[in-house]
């Protein structure tokens, strides 16, 4: 795999640009109108003049790394993590680590932050594309709430309550004498289904004919609005991606 620096070299060479990485920038003072100062070199320092300076802040995970811009009176948004997984300490769902649901919907309760995609249950909580997308959409909100919020999961993607109720009712009518444990929506792994029906108080030996309206309501609600308490975050791979700057 080619690094970003390697990819930039041919372009810099063609444009006769100089790559000084990893030399730090000490300051970017704004010059008064007039002729540009010539480039100069002093001990341990290079001075450059330019009509335009483009600053890309992705490499500064801390606000202190942007201190060289303070003299320009720019609004600097504090960098915060924006691509991470969710910690759900103490939840029995973590016992399903390695379980994947290919199309789930996840949202932050009480907000409009929502994402869809594959969800992975881990030994610390939840991960996968849907969680990473949600963490990026809600990065500032999560930071403001110290990564302590309620996560709502719809295990059947964007399916509405009406659609899920129809599906579960059909399963019940078509399989009255079969065990609920052994008959479930094809999208849901068997281990997850067993966990969900146990969570709503359905016994492993219960049959569909025994479910009843209250059991149906609890099951449907859990399938479309399964809530977990997020308590912290974990790195995605080796680094936190940040937003802000």
Residue ranges and their predicted role:
Residues 1-49:
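Intrinsic disorder/low-complexity segments
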Residues 1, 56-64, 87, 91, ...:
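Short beta-strand to alpha-helix junction loop
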Residues 75-78, 88-211:
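An anion/pyrophosphate-binding glycine-rich loop and adjacent beta-alpha core
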Residues 52-62, 81-84, 111, 126-127:
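Short acidic/polar capping segments at secondary-structure boundaries
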């Amino acid at each position: 795999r080619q690094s970003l620096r390697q990819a930039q070299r041919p372009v810099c060479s063609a444009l006769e640009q100089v790559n000084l990485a990893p030399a730090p920038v000490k300051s970017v003072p704004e010059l008064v109108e007039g002729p540009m100062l010539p480039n100069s070199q002093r001990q341990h320092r290079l001075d450059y003049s330019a009509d335009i300076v483009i600053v890309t802040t992705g490499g500064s995970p801390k606000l202190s790394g942007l201190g060289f811009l303070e003299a320009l009176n720019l609004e600097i948004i504090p960098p915060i993590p924006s691509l991470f997984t969710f910690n759900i300490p103490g939840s029995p769902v973590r016992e399903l680590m390695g379980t994947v649901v290919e199309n789930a919907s996840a949202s932050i309760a009480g907000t409009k932050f929502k994402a869809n995609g594959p969800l992975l249950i881990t030994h610390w909580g939840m991960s996968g594309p849907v969680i990473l997308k949600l963490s990026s959409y809600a990065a500032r909100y999560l930071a403001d709430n110290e990564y302590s919020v309620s996560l709502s999961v719809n295990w059947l993607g964007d399916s509405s309550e009406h659609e899920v109720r129809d599906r579960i009712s059909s399963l019940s009518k078509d399989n009255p004498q079969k065990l609920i444990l052994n008959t479930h929506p094809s999208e849901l792994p068997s281990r997850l289904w067993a966990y969900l029906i146990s969570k709503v108080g359905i016994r492993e030996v219960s049959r569909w004919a025994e479910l009843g309206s209250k059991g149906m309501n609890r099951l449907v609600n859990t399938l479309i609005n399964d809530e977990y308490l997020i308590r912290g975050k974990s790195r995605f791979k080796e680094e936190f991606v940040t937003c802000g700057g």
